[in-house]
């Protein structure tokens, strides 16, 4: 997906280097210097330039349809936000959100904007290939997107207060057809909106438009001077937009004929970054969005919530009086006195003594190889108007008064005086000391004679010239130097900083890039989750340094996770008592599970800090529960373990043999760990015994356990976890432990930690509890999911029953290596992984809703969406052998997925109807991919785990 950016001219030559992106995926240009094209003309210019750069030999109509593109308009003079004019507002650094995990310390507006636009375009139907958006807004949506209709123009809007809508474009729809645009208005009055409200609904335009190839060609045609190929001023919103809809305000036959769909952005939030005020107010609004202290991870309390400091060294104490303060890429020394309503950017390391008045901002811009420009300004300045007009303000006073206060005459100002933006009033110097004197004279000390002399002597440039000639590489180098120091401080001050909530994959790369020493191992009194993050970060840094000990560090992180989960349970010790007659057998059996939405969100550590949501169903195979366990007493005081399916047997005579359960692939790891948890090992027993034999003697018999897993390994149906639950359930009954089904599931999670296989809770809950259910857990080390049963109509009704197909692919893949990879990403707060997991949690709620409504088609489509999400999380989910099977039958399905971690095992398919199901059966039976592949009859289990006695 290509990104096309319209940027300030000075930025386009170094954008790729500064942002470390490639030229293929990112295309940059700027509007022709001196010409105003508007958003419509600018779109035409941007697309034409990209077409010429990548495929000049191909016709435009062919080229536009080949690929999806995101266009961001981010040029302009930035008069009302001078501090980020030179580098473009779209690259404005944005502070880490106090309540969010997985963000990068170096994030900017562009990196925050893009994920939503990519989500939209990934969901857009074929033919809708071009998304257009503005570069000075941040739009958030945490909810799943609705389906995007196949219209020529699709626009997103927000439900807002009418007073806010008067400052923006507004989509107006008839109340009877809310999804269809009736007409569009630009900045309507409150009276206008009130008059419309009886018959119409209105949404505020948030500037996200998707255009079909046809709509793009019409837009481009309107952007050209009639009869020429010259681009003229044409606005996407006020010209093109007003001609859209069923009753458009502007008549234009070709545009009028375009179909339009209006979509409210689900859970949408709109933050504007167009002015100095908005830089602070929008950032404050984002930070203030979450007040629940349980979601705010750091323990620092700022003296004022509207203080934002990033990429900077500050050596002054701040108080509640320093409201609306923004410091970025700057050194603020001990001798500075700050007020409120101030933006300080670009200030190099200095020894200045300066008293900055309220509302006064400082921007220092590197220019050339070693010079700086001093640009102080007022927070309310708009950099507009002739210098001799009383309405033209600079540093919050009329410009003429600023001149008078400093004894400057008109002869002292060379060049243009008709527009403050173009006036050469900002001095250029090489000395940082002189820079400080100039700033003092220009802001708070107008009588400072030395400052006046320096100003008169210096070459001076305008705001326009600053943007055109700023040395952005030097600006970024300074920012990186400050950020390097910030990394050290954040790591050292981890208890009160955002350090361990950051994207630690990015942090590891930065530590290596800046050649920083590794963070120390945290002390044992640190919070368990912080200690886990710390060890995994250290492991990642060591891996980047090709240090062979990185595996040990990684294992330390996993061990801390196990200790955390075991810590909660280790207090629950057991005293097993023989609870059967000498000739009785306890028989446990369980179904397996298919997860249809939210799988992976149940996996620690993600579920521990975010909670999980999963929809899954318990199924029997070929009419019976496939996992079975038999427990009976034996006369000898030892433990005999047998596996029918593996043809294996082992006799255990001591604690050492019993606790040797960490070998992956061992046929008896599960029963050994289960017996340990049941109190047959010192760590989990209420009593102390000198030996296992002595404990069994006190117990009253030896134990014989026989396992039968009538299902292949690596099936993806939660076999190992549910088998563990079945063993625990049978032992629970045999030993009179009085555990309920929730206890059994909790112990299963601990058992998997003992085995070092990891894993979440959805497998055991899916098999132990019957039917189809929504499972939800809260954050915390003690994971006790709430079980909500969903109706089984879609699985048992004759219209749908035969549409659920289960096919064994004959391909296997062990989940442990997949788990370790994804869990490492969770430990490291990988931003893309966390975003996807949050989407998967929300998707589980959509799936639950579809089942509650008995909407079969929606259910099937959502299963397909789950499969797409699983592949995004792990690229090995759909190997070529599996993809080849799917290719044969996909046209007959509403959705399909490999249950569990994927990569092999069983393929679950939702056929469009019983006839399609018949076709799928025929195709895969006739064209089986290997001798083991076969259909298996699946039925919904109405019992879950069952335990009975002979």
Stretches with model-predicted labels:
Residues 1-129, 133, 138-146, 387, ...:
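N-terminal glycine-rich phosphate-binding loop and ensuing alpha1 helix
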Residues 46, 113, 556-564, 674, ...:
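Stable alpha-helical structural segments in soluble proteins, enriched in small hydrophobic residues
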Residues 71-74, 131-134, 156-159, 212, ...:
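Short beta-strand segments
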Residues 80-82, 140-142, 164-166, 192-194, ...:
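Short helix/loop capping segments that flank catalytic or ligand/cofactor-binding pockets
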Residues 87, 91, 715-737:
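DPxDG-like acidic metal-binding loop motif
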Residues 444-697, 746-757, 764-898, 908-950:
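C-terminal nucleotide
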């Amino acid at each position: 997906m290509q990104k096309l950016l319209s940027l300030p001219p000075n930025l386009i030559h170094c954008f790729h280097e500064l942002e470390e992106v490639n030229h293929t995926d990112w295309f940059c240009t700027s509007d022709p210097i001196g010409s105003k094209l508007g958003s419509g003309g600018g779109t035409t210019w941007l697309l034409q330039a990209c077409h010429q750069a990548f495929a000049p030999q191909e016709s435009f109509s062919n080229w536009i349809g080949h690929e999806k593109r995101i266009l961001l308009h981010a040029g302009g003079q930035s008069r009302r936000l001078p501090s980020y004019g030179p580098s473009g507002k779209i690259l404005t650094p944005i502070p880490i959100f106090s309540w969010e995990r997985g963000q990068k310390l170096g994030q900017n507006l562009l990196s925050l904007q893009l994920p939503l636009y990519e989500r939209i375009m990934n969901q857009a139907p074929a033919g809708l290939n071009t998304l257009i958006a503005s570069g000075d807004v941040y739009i958030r949506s945490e909810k799943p997107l609705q389906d995007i209709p196949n219209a020529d123009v699709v626009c997103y809007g927000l439900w807002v207060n009418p007073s806010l809508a008067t400052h923006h474009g507004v989509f107006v729809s008839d109340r009877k057809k809310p999804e269809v645009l009736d007409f569009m208005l630009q900045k309507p009055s409150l009276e206008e909106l009130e008059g419309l409200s009886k018959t119409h609904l209105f949404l505020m335009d948030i500037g996200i438009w998707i255009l079909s190839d046809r709509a793009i060609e019409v837009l481009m045609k309107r952007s050209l001077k009639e009869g020429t190929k010259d681009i003229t001023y044409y606005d996407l919103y006020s010209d093109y937009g007003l001609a859209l809809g069923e009753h458009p305000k502007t008549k234009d036959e070709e545009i009028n004929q375009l179909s339009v769909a209006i979509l409210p952005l689900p859970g949408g939030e709109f933050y504007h970054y167009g002015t100095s005020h908005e830089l602070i107010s929008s950032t404050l609004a984002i930070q203030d969005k979450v007040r629940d202290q349980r979601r705010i991870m750091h323990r620092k309390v700022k003296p004022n919530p509207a203080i934002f400091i990033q990429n900077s060294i500050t050596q002054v104490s701040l108080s509640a009086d320093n409201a609306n303060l923004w410091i970025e890429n700057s050194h603020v020394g001990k001798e500075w006195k700050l007020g409120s309503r101030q933006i300080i950017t670009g200030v190099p390391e200095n020894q200045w003594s300066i008293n900055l008045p309220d509302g006064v901002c400082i921007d220092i811009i590197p220019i050339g190889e070693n010079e700086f420009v001093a640009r102080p300004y007022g927070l309310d300045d708009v950099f507009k108007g002739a210098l001799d007009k009383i309405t033209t303000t600079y540093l919050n006073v009329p410009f003429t008064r600023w001149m008078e206060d400093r004894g400057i005459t008109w002869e002292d100002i060379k060049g243009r005086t008709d527009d403050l933006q173009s006036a050469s009033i900002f001095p250029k110097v090489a000395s940082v000391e002189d820079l400080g004197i100039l700033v003092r004279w220009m802001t708070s000390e107008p009588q400072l004679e030395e400052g006046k002399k320096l100003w008169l002597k210096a070459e001076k440039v305008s705001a326009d010239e600053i943007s055109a000639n700023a040395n952005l590489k030097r600006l970024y180098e300074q920012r990186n130097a400050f950020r390097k120091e910030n990394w050290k401080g954040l790591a050292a001050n981890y208890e009160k900083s955002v350090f361990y909530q950051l994207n630690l994959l990015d942090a590891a790369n930065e530590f290596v890039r800046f050649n920083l020493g590794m963070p120390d191992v945290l002390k044992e009194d640190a919070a368990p989750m912080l200690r886990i993050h710390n060890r995994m970060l250290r492991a990642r840094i060591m891996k980047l340094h090709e240090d062979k000990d990185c595996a040990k560090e990684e294992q330390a992180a996993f061990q801390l996770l196990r200790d955390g989960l075991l810590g909660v349970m280790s207090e629950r010790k057991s005293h097993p008592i023989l609870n059967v007659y000498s000739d009785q057998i306890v028989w446990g059996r369980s179904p397996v599970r298919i997860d249809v939405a939210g799988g992976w969100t149940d996996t620690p550590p993600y579920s521990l800090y975010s909670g999980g949501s999963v929809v899954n169903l318990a199924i029997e195979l070929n009419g019976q529960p496939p996992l079975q366990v038999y427990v009976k007493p034996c006369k000898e005081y030892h433990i005999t373990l047998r596996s029918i399916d593996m043809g294996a047997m082992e006799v255990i005579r001591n604690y050492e043999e019993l606790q040797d359960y960490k070998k992956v692939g061992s046929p008896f790891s599960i029963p050994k760990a289960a017996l340990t948890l049941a109190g047959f090992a010192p760590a989990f027993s209420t009593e102390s015994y000198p030996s296992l034999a002595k404990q069994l003697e006190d117990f009253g018999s030896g134990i014989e356990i026989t396992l039968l897993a009538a299902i292949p390994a690596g099936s993806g149906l939660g076999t190992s976890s549910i088998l563990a639950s079945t063993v625990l359930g049978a032992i629970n009954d045999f030993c009179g432990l009085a555990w309920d089904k929730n206890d059994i599931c909790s112990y299963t999670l601990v058992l998997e930690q003992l085995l070092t296989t990891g894993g979440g809770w959805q497998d055991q809950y899916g098999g132990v509890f019957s039917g189809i259910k929504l499972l939800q857990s809260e954050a915390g080390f003690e994971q006790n999911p709430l079980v909500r049963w969903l109706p089984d109509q879609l699985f048992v009704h004759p219209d749908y029953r035969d549409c659920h197909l289960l096919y064994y692919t004959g391909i296997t893949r062990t989940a442990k290596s997949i788990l370790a990879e994804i869990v490492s990403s969770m430990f490291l707060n990988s931003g893309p992984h966390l975003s996807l997991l949050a989407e998967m949690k929300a998707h589980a709620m959509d799936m639950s809703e579809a089942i509650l409504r008995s909407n079969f088609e929606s259910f099937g489509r959502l299963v397909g969406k789950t499969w797409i999400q699983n592949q995004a999380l792990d690229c090995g989910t759909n190997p070529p052998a599996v993809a080849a099977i799917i290719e044969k039958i996909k046209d007959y399905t509403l959705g399909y997925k490999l249950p569990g971690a994927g990569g092999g095992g069983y393929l679950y398919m939702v056929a469009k109807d019983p006839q399609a199901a018949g076709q799928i059966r025929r195709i895969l039976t006739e064209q089986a991919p290997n001798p083991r592949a076969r259909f298996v009859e699946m039925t919904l289990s109405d019992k879950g785990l069952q335990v009975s006695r002979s």
